[in-house]
Amino acid sequence: AMDEISDVMTDFARTLQLEGSENFVRLDPVDLTVVIQQPGGRVPLSRMGSAENWVGYHLVAHLALHRWFCDKDRPVPRFVMFDQSTQAFFPEEVVDAADDENADWEAVRRQFALMRDVVANLDGQLQIIASDHANLQDDWFQEGVIENWRNGVALIPEDWLDEQSSI
């Protein structure tokens, strides 16, 4: 099982073009971390460098595990939520990432395309909920957007917060 999951993690890491993905990527079940198996030894996630790698390898691990759970019909909930998985691509706090010229938009696109492809390849057995500042204009991306929480529209309506403060 771990070899299957590791093969998928390696493929996904290469799709995202993560640093170190030219090597074999795997989960270390003893230390509960992602590691890269290089010719000179193993490199744990804690030594992989950038925030893009940290977030990317977490994403890869979750997607590979969920794919395995679906493929093997394991009793694991068939959804996963990613909150701001593209945060590493935006140099500052942004309200609307569409206006950020410094973002690595191709890396953002690869991340969301991987999520889309995993769901499609599993024939809808997995639901991915993503909340993010990124808002790609690609048709395939916009078709997956349920709600843009901007300009006063929010996951938790303001009047709910007002009601709570009076309790």
Can you name each region flagged by the protein language model?
Residues 49, 71-74, 118-123:
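Conserved catalytic network of the ASCE P-loop NTPase/AAA+ motor domain
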Residues 83-85:
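Walker B catalytic acidic pair
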Residues 60-71:
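Metal-dependent nuclease catalytic cores in nucleic-acid-processing enzymes
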Residues 5-17, 64-65, 111, 115-123:
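Hydrophobic, Leu/Ile/Phe/Ala-enriched alpha-helical segments that form helix-helix packing faces
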Residues 35-62:
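Conserved ABC ATPase signature
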Residues 95-167:
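C-terminal lobe/lid and adjacent interdomain/linker elements of RecA-like ASCE P-loop ATPase modules
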Residues 1-41, 72-79, 91:
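Extended, charged coiled-coil "arm/hinge" scaffolds of SMC/Rad50-like chromosome-maintenance ATPases
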Residues 43, 87-90, 136-139:
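Flexible loop/turn segments at secondary-structure boundaries
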